[in-house]
From Swiss-Prot:
Residue numbers binding NAD(+): D283, G334, V335, G336
Required co-factors: K(+)
Molecular function GO labels: IMP dehydrogenase activity; metal ion binding; nucleotide binding
Source species of the chain: Mycobacterium leprae (strain TN)
Protein name: Inosine-5'-monophosphate dehydrogenase
Residues bound to K(+): G336, G338, C341, E511, S512, H513
Keyword GTP-binding: no
Keyword Amino-acid biosynthesis: no
Gene that encodes the chain: guaB
UniProt xrefs under InterPro entries: Aldolase_TIM, CBS_dom, CBS_dom_sf, IMP_DH, IMP_DH/GMP_Rdtase_CS, IMP_DH_GMPRt
Matching NCBIfam families: IMP_dehydrog
Sequence positions that bind IMP: S339, D374, G375, G376, G397, S398, Y421, R422, G423, M424, G425, E458
Enzyme Commission no: 1.1.1.205
SUPFAM superfamilies, alphabetized: CBS-domain pair, Inosine monophosphate dehydrogenase (IMPDH)
């Protein structure tokens, strides 16, 4: 028997206790016919089935503290995480999410080296001090330097000799008017002596050197002149521009990445750790599985607390308990709620998301393990409901897929802009394209399919309206969450988790949306269904 399994009686007891929190309006779920009163375990509720009850409040929405735990050891200033989907999160989205106060999770539907390279891109995008800066040699060509700068989106490189000693620096200004790209760096670079800083320099002292000498890059060297780091003026500017940014102890942006349980899963995980990833998500459609539990446990033994490990996805209390027992630092909840997911229709399996969150929290809460609500979130109010149900953070797919930072293809239809968006269980995600292999199949335990025309998809491909920059979308989502905290008298997410729901009827849902009027101007945070 899989560890962490609980009996239906235990599950029913919890549901009965949760009825009170949901308004006490539920009929006896056992009265469903047949001889087994526990055959139907519970009534499943999702976001459209409930509303948060307003409460006495002295909370001004703008002052509410929306920070929350992502994992046992990582706290986000904004409880939003972008989904590990190939039309949602690559390096550009991960950088933007971290700067906004959340975090991005890089998808795994690409070769191992490319995913690790995207981790490096995020980690190098800004830092208090780059401790392992990209460098070049004096005998490199300008073409080689240009390729490195383009790959890492940087404007120049320190030049070091074979011993690692600083020999000079080369920047865009040095190369801008050079036509011959076969020239060596030594012919063009600014040679030593350069303005440098000693190891251990403080941020204030480094900023002073940059200002006084009107330079943009400050190499850090040891007592023997060997390069040990690089400080750039852009990092100080970025810190001022993005005060909520989620960073590690070295001032670098936080980033997560998804791994599976298939053939290359362990190699992928170790390469991501070496690249500097902060969070690994063992990302499958059904985490209450021996392969997933063993992978979570093995990762925790190997890397300890150096990298946080999240397990998912689950929809039951027993599954969440199994992940907690395996050592997961957070549990991701959601079997079939996503807009592009067809698992509940194809397999007939799943649990409505509010109930799934409540069940997972019952197992994770006493253990101090945060819950991540993944999927089914259509409006900012759904984020508030997910957190009120006990989740600590939310993972977003469709809400972010239409942003400029999402990697989906931009499409024009009848003069309107859309972006492609697909589930990771869709045929497009699970089938290879040309010489490109799909790495998504094992998420649905379908990597043993004899041929791609034998795949059984659990997702669809579609498009979502183009929403513009991520920052605008995040502003609206955070604004809705803050409004909910004001209405419920919740100064923190932890207090919001104690808010009470009321169950509503289909008529109540209809009343909740705009009605009896024709919309003439679109609101930035409401999209008719």
């Amino acid at each position: 028997m899989i560890r962490g399994m609980s009996n239906l009686k235990e599950s029913s007891d919890f549901v009965a206790s949760s009825y009170v929190r949901l308004g006490g309006l539920m009929d006896d779920p056992a009265a469903t016919g047949g001889d087994n009163p526990h055959k139907v375990a519970m009534l499943g509720l999702t976001f459209d089935d409930v509303l948060l009850l307003p409460a006495a409040s002295d909370v001004v929405p703008a002052t509410a503290d929306i920070s929350s735990q992502l994992t046992k050891k990582i706290r986000l200033k904004v409880p939003l995480v972008s989904s590990a989907m190939d039309t949602v999160t690559e390096a550009r989205m991960a950088i933007a999410m971290a700067r906004a106060g959340g975090m991005g999770v890089l998808h795994r539907n690409l070769p191992v080296g490319e995913q690790a390279g995207q981790v490096e891109t995020v980690k190098r995008s800004e830092a208090g001090m780059v401790t392992d800066p990209v460098t070049c040699r004096p005998d490199n060509t300008l073409a080689q330097v240009g390729a490195l700068c383009a790959r890492f989106r940087i404007s120049g490189l320190p030049v070091v000799d074979d011993s690692g000693a600083l020999a000079g620096i080369i920047t865009n200004r040095d190369m801008r008017f050079e036509v011959d790209q076969s020239k060596q760096v030594a012919e063009v670079m600014t040679k030593t002596p350069l303005i440098t800083a000693a190891e251990g320099v403080s941020a204030d002292a480094a900023l002073g050197l940059l200002r006084r000498n009107k330079i943009e890059k400050l190499p850090v060297v040891d007592g023997h002149g060997r390069l040990t780091g690089l400080i750039t003026v852009k990092d100080f500017v970025k810190t001022e521009q993005h005060p909520l940014a989620t960073k590690d102890n070295d001032g670098r942006l936080l980033v997560g990445a998804a791994v599976g349980v298939g053939g290359d899963a362990w190699v992928r995980a170790m390469m991501l750790v070496d690249a500097g990833v902060d969070v690994l998500i063992v990302d499958t459609a059904h985490a209450h599985n021996r392969l997933v539990l063993d992978m979570v446990g093995k990762l925790k033994v190997e890397i300890g607390d150096r990298v946080q490990v999240i397990g998912g996805n689950v929809a039951t209390r027993s599954a969440a308990a199994a992940l907690v027992e395996a050592g997961a630092d957070a549990v991701k909840v959601g079997v079939g709620p996503g807009s592009t997911c067809t698992t509940r229709v194809v397999a007939g399996v799943g649990a409505p998301q509010i109930t799934a969150i409540l069940e997972a929290v019952a197992a994770c809460g006493p253990a101090g393990v945060p819950v991540i609500a993944d999927g089914g979130l259509q409006y900012s109010g759904d984020i508030a409901k997910a957190l009120a149900a006990g989740a600590s953070t939310t993972m977003l797919g469709s809400l972010l897929a239409g942003t400029a930072e999402a990697p989906g293809e931009l499409i024009f239809v009848n003069g309107k802009q859309f972006k492609s968006y697909r589930g990771m269980g869709s045929l497009g995600a699970m089938q290879g394209r040309g010489g490109d292999k799909s790495y998504s199949k094992d998420r649905y335990f379908a990597d043993d399919a004899l041929s791609e025309d034998k795949l059984v998809p659990e997702g669809i491909e579609g498009r979502v309206p183009f929403r513009g920059p991520l920052s605008s979308v995040i502003h609206q989502l955070v604004g809705g969450l803050r409004a909910a905290m004001g209405y419920t008298g919740s100064p923190t997410i932890e207090v919001l988790q104690q808010a009470q729901f009321v169950r509503i009827t289909p008529a109540g849902l209809k009343e909740s949306h705009p009605h009896d009027v024709a919309m003439t101007v679109e609101a930035p945070n409401y999209y008719p269904r």
